A protein has these predicted regions:
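Short coil turns and loop connectors of transmembrane beta-barrels in diderm outer membranes
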Residues: 15-18, 58-60, 74, 107-109, ...
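Outer-membrane beta-barrel translocator domains and adjoining extracellular loop/strand segments
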Residues: 32-40, 76-84, 120-132, 173-181, ...
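Gram-negative outer-membrane beta-barrel transporters
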Residues: 70-72, 90-176
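Membrane-embedded beta-barrel scaffold of Gram-negative outer-membrane proteins
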Residues: 14, 20-26, 44-106, 114-118, ...
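Signature of Gram-negative outer-membrane beta-barrel scaffolds
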Residues: 1-16, 37
Length: 245
């Protein structure tokens, strides 16, 4: 039982009609009672993050957001194996600094895009065993790129068709606290097609294809050689129907 004050704040300054500057600061607090009940008493994870950035228009219908951030966290839980047994402990201080870039909007009347890129420099700063190591499951590079094309009316009666395709990926990540091995980076491709029947209540059939090349990849590690790695979703196809009321 108890309470914790977690302040946060931000400010936005509109430099011009097309350019906004912003800054945010926030403290974080996360109890670790769910795992502490099994592994023993663990202190809560606490941290503070700072972010500055700008939102602006690149061209008519195309906007971008660029942000710089730094985040410090203490008491970050990690697992390790000692004499065949898995234990959970906490690192003294973990720092992550990076940049995020997002671009979205219309390239033409028919073609639109969403693109993102992130760079993260993360390191364990204070820990008797792992100081200077790369934190588990934190990629240095992440990114995605997706295009959507609107064919407009197809098949008559006002019926419309949209298709899209893109890719998402991440760079290599530390698989264990000692950095003895790394999960390899990956890029997977996705696609979709949506056909809308113009009726009294428009009906849309949409086919979503995930990992269309059926690439084997790993999304994360438990951080312990005893427990292994999480394999990414294989190829899947999902057809959905929706009605607009």
């Amino acid at each position: 039982n108890g309470s914790k004050w977690i302040p946060s704040g931000g400010v936005v300054y509109k430099l011009t009609p097309d350019i906004s500057l912003y800054a945010n600061v926030a403290k974080t607090f996360r109890p670790q009672s769910s795992i502490a009940s099994y592994y023993g008493n663990l202190p809560p994870e606490e941290g503070v993050s700072y972010e500055i950035g700008s939102k602006f228009e690149i061209a008519d219908g195309l906007t971008a957001n660029v942000a710089l951030y730094t985040s410090d966290k203490k008491n970050v839980a990690y697992s390790e194996v000692i004499n065949g047994e898995t234990y959970v402990q906490t690192a003294g201080l973990v720092r992550a600094r990076g940049v995020e870039v997002d671009v979205a909007g219309e390239l033409t009347d028919e073609l639109s895009m969403i693109a993102s890129y992130g760079f993260t420099d993360a390191k364990v700063l204070e820990d008797p065993t792992y100081a200077g190591k790369w934190p588990v499951n934190v990629p240095r590079h992440t990114g995605s790129l997706f295009f959507t094309y609107d064919f407009g009316e197809v098949g008559g009666n006002g019926n419309t068709l949209k298709v899209g395709m893109g890719a998402r990926g991440a760079g290599k990540r530390a698989g264990i606290n000692t950095n003895a091995y790394f999960l390899p980076g990956y890029i997977v491709a996705d696609a979709f097609a949506a056909y809308t029947f113009q009726m009294e209540r428009p009906l849309t059939l949409q086919l979503n294809l995930k990992n269309i090349l059926n690439k084997t990849y790993y999304t994360s590690s438990i951080g312990s050689t005893n427990l292994g790695n999480q394999i990414g979703e294989p190829f899947s196809a999902v057809l959905t129907a929706s009605v607009k009321f």
